[in-house]
Amino acid sequence: MKIPHSKAGFGSMAAFLAACAIAWPPADGEDLPDLSQFKPLKTDSGEPVFFEDFNEGLNGWTNPGNSFTWRNQEGMVGTGCVLAERDTYDGRDLTIQKKIPLKHGIRYRLRVHYRTEMKEDPLYKWKKQEYFCIRYLDPATEKTIYAAVDSETRHEPDSKPDWTEWSHDFYVPEIYSSTILLELRMHSKRLGKVWIDDVSIEPAEAIGATLFPVRNSEMTYDPEAGITYFMKLPLNRQESDFRLLVEAGGIKKMLEPKNGYANGTFGRFPDGTLHLKATLLDMPGKAVIGVDESVLYVRDVENIPGRIVVEPDGRMIRDGKPFLPVGVYAGYNRPSDTNKLQRIRDAGFNCVEQVWSHAVYTGKKNTAKETLLASVREMAKYDLGFLCAIKHQIPQCKAKIESVDGVEGLDNVTRYIIDAIKREPNLIGYYVADENPIIQLPAIRHLRRLTSELDPWHPTMTLTCRDDHFLFFADSGDYLMFDSYPVGYFYTKDSPRQSMALSHKSIKMIRDAGAPFVWVPQIFNWNAEIKILPVRYPTAKEVRSMVLLGAIYDARAYFFYAYHCIFYQSENVDEQWANASQAARLISSLSPWLLSCESAPKAEVKQISGAEVAARAFVHEGKPLVIITADGPDECEAEIRVPGVTGLKSRYGNTEEVSPGVYRFKGLHIDSDVLGGE
């Protein structure tokens, strides 16, 4: 086996940034623009662009199956409204729909007013409500696109006899038509009555271009590396048309974008909070198209045991060595599950994610702080790291804790938690968001800033399950996590014909969101919780393939979802856990390649038939490795050409070398292979 000449990657943050972005022009006053000559970033007025009071009935609404009826005197002020009513389960969402023209580049706020009289369903006992769904349309056909939706559920098991407002922020991605299909609904698993009235959509703010500071480990300012901004410019525009005006600590500089980033050095500042303001300027159009106000922290960071430094490429350096977290969501604990940490470690995982108040492994102590500390140290006995979930510590979350151990106030409790564990050597970081709606992002960003101000040694991770929210969430953590659970979804059910194509589509997009990527692959099935619908658990091959898909796209950590779903809600526990364990051990064994800075030849994929095949080559200590995945469903075939890399062997028997450096892969449904030496 042989590979072509390889070279080491960038050795420092400063070198990396110097290679990817430059500052232009110098900060002399005469080179700075007169912002009064630029049109400010503006949105439409705050007046609703759509309003429906149903006083005129269902005019203009499509009512499939006559799901809703009009009530002319049951609305908010004794006027019109609509009603969905169901006494027996019929397996369908009750909906009405209407197309509404909007605009790209604006964040909108949908407001829906409702009241309910719910009945308990003896079959499902479903406790969530969902009153609306925004469906995006194909720009060519104006037809709906499967999975191109925006909706929100809320834990609401009981009736809401009084009129209640539900507000939801959204925007229309530029890849879709600017017209949306608004759907009002009663969830398929709820019985009773739902009244809806006064539905409006209003502009909340202009989105403009996305920009935020990046490559600052734990929000710490590095004077040698300078300040780097990520920018997502408007479609069909050239970077050369734009300049970024950055003000940091009273110093202003104009920066030139290059490959989606702009970097400049600003010198040294006194310790404390460094306030930043960046203004993205359209130079030919003389317009402001984006503004960001952020902070970094100026400080000397003590080098404590377990410190994690986030490299510019997203790699974690822990105690001076590259580190790949391979963890599992631990969920809640059952008292009878006394072997949990040992089981997780034996399965090949090196860390766990868990809400801080759920981490009880040595019994409850006199204080919550003592309980948490004892549990984190118990994890350390099993050589397990801890990703501490503080995601509930925002005002909008019902599970937030505002009083503990005599400490009062939401932020004070958060400080108390972080101060208790931030010096623990096995702490991995903090989990600050979990599939939140974008309306909660200001609170999540505040939580991230508070966390990083208190703990300069460990990163924050923020998660969304929606690819159209990547750009919004990317600045709310050091890492952007994505979870996707394609196996056994409602449309594939228990069929062997599974596909991870939608997961693949989203993962491709996350690379362009500006933050390093953490992958949350599936090891469970939601239907096990319901215990009515067919349950289709991921096979060993499917789990392996989903995990390897993340490796192709530079996942910097893996957190499998989820332990509690397998052990507390499922059947066939041993088989499911074995499938998860095989994948965890595999990805850990590949970490020297996944974390390597050695350059590798490009793996060129020629699709021959079937679902999409992806591949990537890695090199560690001169030894090549190739990872291949197939989206599924059905049979597929592809030719993977890896220039100069010959003699690789298939680990799973799906691939053969047909000529020097050319490999033929054949897969079935969700599939994968790993090519390496003997």
Language-model segments: what does each one mean?
Residues P33-Q37, E165-V199, T273:
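Extracellular beta-strand ligand-recognition surfaces/modules
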Residues E52-F54, L94-E130, W166-V172, D198-P203, ...:
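Extra-cytoplasmic beta-strand recognition segments
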Residues D53-A84:
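Extracellular glycan-recognition surfaces and repeat-rich motifs
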Residues T141-Y176:
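Extracellular carbohydrate recognition and processing domains
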Residues T338-E402, G406-G409, Q440-P459, P496-Q498:
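Aromatic-lined substrate-binding rim segments of carbohydrate-active enzymes
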Residues I394-C397, I507-A540:
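Active-site clefts of carbohydrate-active enzymes
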Residues Q607-T646, S672, G677:
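Carbohydrate-binding surface patches
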Residues S659-E678:
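C-terminal beta-strand-rich structural cap/linker in extracellular carbohydrate-active enzymes
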